[in-house]
Swiss-Prot record:
It comes from Laribacter hongkongensis (strain HLHK9). Belongs to the UPF0386 family. This is UPF0386 protein LHK_03186.
Length: 85
């Protein structure tokens, strides 16, 4: 599966315990999304277009109206990255 660099970064943050929050307008449409890391920072690479691509590829999912998290397919699609921790 072809995954772009911003999608890969977002999946990596989600695999480490992050989540995606949708922000809606008054009409109920999703206007922006925020990808939060497990440390509480916000990832700037996660845009509405990236979120829609990940959702269309079924790499992220939401259960019971909770924030979006990575699912099994997303974990299999993400490539390993080295971290300085």
């Amino acid at each position: 599966m072809n995954i772009s660099r911003p999608e890969q970064r977002t999946l990596h943050v989600l695999a480490k315990g992050g989540y995606i929050v949708r922000i809606r307008d008054d009409a109920g449409r999703i206007t922006t999304v925020e990808c939060h890391t497990r440390e509480g920072h916000i990832l700037s690479d996660c845009t509405l277009a990236v979120f829609q691509k990940l959702k269309a590829k079924r790499l992220v999912s939401s259960k019971n109206s909770q924030p979006y998290r990575i699912n099994r397919n997303g974990l299999l699609a993400v490539r390993a990255q080295l971290d300085n921790q």
